[in-house]
Amino acid sequence: MRNITSMLFSHKPSSDPEASFYEPLLSEHDRNIILPSPPTSHEKYLYVKSGRWLISIFGLLSSTCLMTGMWLFIVATGTYWFSVFAAVSTVYLYVSYLMVNCVGKDFNLRVHRNIQKLNSRGCPAVDILLPVCGEDFEVIHNTWTYVTALDWPTKTVYVLDDKKDPKIRDLAQRFGFNYITRENNHMKKAGNLRNAFTKTTAPFFAIFDADFCPRSDYLKEIMPYFSHDDKIAIVQTPQFFEVRPDQTWVERAAGSVQELFYRFIQVSRDTFGGAVCVGTCAVYRRESLVPFGGTAEIGFSEDVHTGFAVVDDGWKLKYIPLNLAKGVCPYELKSFFSQQYRWALGSTTLCTNPHFWKSNLSFRQKACFLSGMLYFQVTAFATVLATIPGLIMLARFPEHVLWFNATFALPSLIFGWILMPVWSAQDYPFTVNHLKVAQSYSHLFAIKDKLMGTMMLWESTGGAGAATSSANRFLQGRILCGLVTAFSLVFTYGMTYYYVHHGYALVNFLPGLFLTALNTLTNSPFIMNRQD
């Protein structure tokens, strides 16, 4: 159990206007919660340099080697049904790297600063929307403390409480925030935001999830873009996450997992106007959403659909990789699984909608969104299919199991285990590999549910409030992973023993034994739901 007292004191702003009622939280109870603070001046610029060439060159190289080995396996063994998975993976490789990431441009900090200088006059009114739905009281209080420190004279803060919690209402009153509820919780978070859209009036509004703490200069860095270009509808910044030694391994790894998307992929997509809106840590121009009655009305990933809608309507979505707010990741596997499920479902739902293909987005913008959907599909199918080539080779073609066949997979191992930690601007622990297993299985169940029409709706991120349906998906994912892992382990080691006993050279089976053992080690925390 972690003591949060020191964190509360160390992260409290010196100008905290609510210091008089900060004290009672210290003695309420010692909970397993990390309270974030805004990004430091150093953290603010961590994502400005994307390290594009390292990721692009080695990512493309490792993926090409893997795809080459996969296609050679299909041709050599006649396993042509496997070509469906190989084809999807190859298309993803082409679209993601050759059409988006390798040809994207880096963020230009000098241009950004010029925009600040030339468009810094005036302070248009901004509504700050704080949707809450049963999150931890300490987390909410911590975030609101930093919201009050936003340096913008014409801001008005609204708390959007979908739980109608008297404690939250009282806290909002003490902070001087406006408090909004509604009669029902229709469409969950999306409905909450749409309801607030009808009850607020400022020409711009910002959204902060319950755990995201903004820097005081948040609006000063973003608002000049709207006066610089009157066609910009949304300015999106990264979801930057706290990564500290006193967090659970899930929190630390989850924060590191997101860096690639916000530091590299989003920047590449912004080159073509195809960046994704992620809801929180963004500022919106109200005028652009009036035709839709506010943000998108959908039960999951309303942010992605909102961004798509405004771009389709002729507006622009701008992404700037400045870390201007910091939050915390889910601290347990079940919550992380549910979060990733929603994100995969949102992207898949958008790109499988016929309107997406008929939309006004350019070819390159559609490629940006398509690469996201294909990523979820490839990672989902890989959970079960990645081990199949090795198993088929053992079962049917043991004479062709040669040690150097593993060289097709070697660049991918180097890329994930060595180059990614070197590239990362934050800590990149080995446990990231454990978390990617949970991530992949969440994608698998999201796609399965999309195909079968059994999707889960949105729920607030957090371990205590997980819904039964989410818990069931999580348990099913762990069981499936356990079965696949156990079968692969027993079959690989059993068949290897059999073949070596009958005169085959052990050296040719060593790479397979090593990779199977490594796969078992990597999958185990997800299977066992290990939290420490």
Please report, for each region that a protein language model flagged, where it lies by residue.
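Catalytic donor-sugar/metal-binding loop of nucleotide-sugar-dependent glycosyltransferases
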Residues: 298, 307-325
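Cell-envelope/extracellular polymer assembly enzymes that use nucleotide-activated donors
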Residues: 124-127, 156, 305
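N-terminal membrane-anchoring/stem segments of glycan-assembly enzymes
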Residues: 1-122, 172, 379-383, 499-532
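Short, acidic, metal-binding catalytic loop of nucleotide-sugar glycosyltransferases
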Residues: 144-154
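Membrane-proximal soluble regions of multi-pass membrane proteins
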Residues: 427-461
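Long helical/loop segments within the catalytic core of UDP-sugar-dependent glycosyltransferases
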Residues: 103-104, 180-204, 216-300, 311-312, ...
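The conserved acidic donor/metal-binding loop of glycosyltransferases
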Residues: 209-213, 310
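A conserved acidic beta->alpha catalytic loop
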Residues: 153, 161-168, 184-185
